[in-house]
């Protein structure tokens, strides 16, 4: 491993925000790139993000939060019933060459528990885009390995989407 990069994950959700997740999201579809859906979240300042669901039913989201000048990574799975809303957990994203570790706020989307982390380190996006594999694990024993094939093109599409939002 080329090194451990620690950066600040900013706890993105409060109890209030968790209650909002039960309401309908203000999200619209923008396009598709391979297995990734490109979407726009009005509540995040028209932030574009990519979303996919992998084999075990885990939903992964990655994108921009323009009204906070950063990005986010979120992951949800209906089997993770031990995740307690409002708490936070230490999460590590391990890419081909680097690791990023920080706190993620527990969240829920569509009835699925999971976590959401805001980041302002562009290296996270760069590694997500260029790596072939990502392993996500937390201090509670949740672990998932994700094939990132085709992700670079999806990240480019998210960036194009974000540029269109600024017009």
Regions found by a protein language model. Name each.
Residues 23-167:
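A generic "folded-domain core" signal
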Residues 1-5:
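N-terminal secretory signal peptides that target proteins for export/translocation
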Residues 8-19:
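Bacterial N-terminal signal peptides
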